[in-house]
Amino acid sequence: MYHRHSAPPPPGRSRGYPPPQQQWPPQPYQYLPYPPQGPPPAHTFPPPAHRSYPSPYPTPPPHSPSPYQYPHHGHSQSWSAPALPPRPPLEAQQFGNGAPSHYRFQYSACTGRRRALLIGINYIGQPNQLRGCINDVTNMSTFLHERYGYRREDMVILTDDQKNPLSIPTKANILRAMQWLVKDAQPNDSLFLHFSGHGGRTPDLDGDEEDGYDDVIYPVDYRVAGHIVDDEMHNIMVRPLRPGVRLTVIFDSCHSGTALDLPYVYSTQGILKEPNLAKEAAQDLFSAISSYGKGDLSGVAMTAIGFLKKAAKGDSARKRTVMTKTSPADVVMFSGSKDTQTSADTFQDGEARGALSWAFIKSLRQWPNQSYLQLLNSIRAQLEGKYTQKPQLSCSHPLGAWVMRAIEEPA
């Protein structure tokens, strides 16, 4: 049964909003063009995004035919160049850390085919319009092509300023493009996904989230077609991958810490994060008191509900995630913020940008051969002092002693 929201979320400056009291629950996995039979869903909506600066929409680059038939479209610390990280072994590796003992994964040598799916949604003409998301995709496309050898014809670009209806980031087009990204992927292929737009949270229905909420992203037609849940994205893009396939993911949106439901989360020191209910309880209590003082009764209620769910099933949810959401492939994701945080737009190099997208490209331009953990640290250094968000690193497997370079250069 579907639930309608009681009220839209409050306005905000960022790419998402606090957890709503009720939201349209995840739909069964369906990869056919929308709409299905029946009435469209109801949703809570991302908040209006207030910006004080103009941002002209960039002109897409010339069209090159692709297999998917899409047109193409400072506060930084002084660091010395990181030492070149070691290459990982190519043989199958054991998971450990609570995963089944017989289950193994394999790193990618990144010597095969390269594909990229880049999604930027400004929500043009909608109350929650953003400014920098299309710019993010334009810059990421150029960066991948010039620095890492991704061919234009092997990129699918979805932005809401295009004329071709297949290139608009609707829910149906996004799901179909995600399928295209991973279709027939072979060991040592390099796949890349970048999403810049609104994100949010919805009550978890399958028990795999420690905090009781799934992360979601919002297509341009979310008011009609609905959001896309992390479980669905995992099922499309992670579960089908074979051992040795690399999938690198960038989610520049709010509440995106576990947007692909990857079970292993790392800190800047490389230590696998474990749930700390005692610490989170204190934080939740402080959040509840702060919300009450601001008159935000819904914030009090959601904080209390979230903590009760954590206390009741946090540990079991993590075990369930490790048992069911690992992958024999080589999947790594950088997200713009923790599950409970919002992500900001910024104004850099004369244009509106997403903070994570900007810091990701800037860090790799300065130091191309970084490990995942080095890159996480350098991204945070770029953002430190400007934004409260803390980008996250999560993986489909434990990183172990071997640390792969964040993105491999062409062979």
Swiss-Prot record:
Listed Pro residues bias regions: 7-65
Catalytic residues (UniProt): H198, C254
One GO term describing the cellular component: cytoplasm
Pfam families: Peptidase_C14
Enzyme class: hydrolase
Record-listed E.C. numbers: 3.4.22.-
Keyword terms of this UniProt record: Apoptosis, Hydrolase, Protease, Thiol protease, Zymogen
GO biological process: apoptotic process; proteolysis
Gene Ontology molecular function terms on file: cysteine-type endopeptidase activity
Stretch list, region Disordered: 1-97
Residue pairs linked by disulfide bridges in the UniProt entry: none
Stated family: Belongs to the peptidase C14B family.
Function noted in UniProt: Involved in cell death (apoptosis).
PANTHER family: METACASPASE (EUROFUNG), METACASPASE-4
Protein name: Metacaspase-1B
Organism of derivation: Neosartorya fischeri (strain ATCC 1020 / DSM 3700 / CBS 544.65 / FGSC A1164 / JCM 1740 / NRRL 181 / WB 181)
